[in-house]
């Protein structure tokens, strides 16, 4: 019931066989659909899976979500926090070099326990509390300057526009290295930088010269409005938190809003892991530090502008 022409189209990718045809072919040749479609020589039935120790496919886990992938970031962060773990540096380095698999995962969990139970070095000279009352107790005194309500709207609008404009300026070249960015800017007559980088700057000849993929980026001369970006999403998300919970919102409210309003891939590094922690049932404040090597990265510092807007 299958013509030669149909098979040729399937082989070349011109068309895809209907499910009924696939079933007919598998029956005709006496092979299972698993073998035919997935290349498996043995069919795995549901009953087998019930008693199997199922493992994740570690290579498919994003590095930000795999604690072991950031184990040297954990070491650096922990030593910056004054934790006495230098004697384990060789262990951290050895685990870091392992392939991305179950063994690396298990050993990283052992190192995490070492970090959790480590003492602060006696010679550590900094005081870095996490509790708000303790932070306030250590801060310097400062005088509050009264703001003119007439100017606030214009200032807040300017701050929001500044964030958008600056974000768009960097969006076109996020991740590029200076040894490629500077030659590129010189070649496009934009060095020192005095205007936005344009799509019209990116010719095929220019793009072939660099490892950075300029062709796939977003540019101001091909858009009508600001595209979504994590560096602007959080400001909008903060507004939604206040709209839904008022000024007396709690960390738990924030976790619920994060899960509700954005998918996982909208978050990066520390925020990505915190999101995954919410999903797994870890709640604030533990969710902000549990298996997060990136916990003191710049993300939190650059997400707080909205709270300044509404508390002038």
Predicted features along the sequence, with ranges:
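Recognition helix of helix-turn-helix/homeodomain-like DNA-binding domains
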Residues: 2-16, 38
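Acidic active-site catalytic centers that drive phospho-/nucleotidyl reactions
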Residues: 11, 34, 230
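DNA major-groove recognition helix of helix-turn-helix/homeodomain DNA-binding modules
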Residues: 20-35
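Charged, helix-prone or intrinsically disordered regulatory segments positioned adjacent to compact structured domains
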Residues: 33-52
């Amino acid at each position: 019931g299958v013509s030669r022409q149909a098979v040729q189209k399937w082989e070349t990718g011109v068309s895809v066989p209907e499910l009924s045809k696939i079933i007919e072919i598998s029956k005709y040749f006496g092979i299972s659909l698993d073998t035919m479609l997935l290349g498996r020589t043995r069919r795995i039935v549901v009953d087998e899976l019930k008693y199997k120790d199922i493992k994740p496919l570690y290579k498919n886990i994003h590095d930000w979500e795999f604690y072991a992938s950031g184990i040297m970031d954990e070491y650096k962060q922990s030593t910056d926090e004054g934790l006495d773990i230098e004697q384990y540096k060789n262990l951290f380095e050895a685990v870091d070099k392992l392939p991305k698999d179950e063994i690396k995962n298990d050993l990283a969990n052992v190192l995490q326990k070492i970090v959790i139970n480590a003492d602060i070095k006696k010679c550590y000279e900094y005081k870095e509390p996490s509790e708000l009352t303790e932070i306030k107790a250590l801060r310097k005194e400062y005088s509050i300057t009264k703001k003119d309500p007439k100017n606030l709207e214009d200032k807040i609008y300017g701050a929001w526009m500044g964030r958008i404009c600056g974000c768009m300026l960097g969006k076109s070249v996020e991740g590029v290295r200076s040894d490629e960015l500077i030659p590129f800017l010189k070649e496009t007559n934009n060095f020192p930088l005095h205007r936005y980088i344009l799509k019209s700057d990116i010719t095929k000849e220019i793009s072939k010269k660099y490892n950075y993929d300029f062709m796939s980026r977003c540019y101001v001369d091909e858009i009508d409005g600001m595209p979504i970006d994590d560096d602007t999403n959080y400001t909008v998300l903060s507004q939604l938190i206040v709209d839904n919970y008022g000024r007396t919102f709690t960390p738990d409210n924030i976790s619920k809003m994060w899960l509700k309003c954005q998918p996982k891939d909208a978050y990066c590094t520390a925020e990505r892991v915190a999101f995954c922690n919410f999903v797994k049932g870890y709640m604030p404040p533990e969710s902000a530090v549990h298996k997060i090597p990136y916990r003191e990265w710049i993300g939190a510092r650059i997400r707080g502008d909205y709270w300044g807007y509404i508390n002038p």
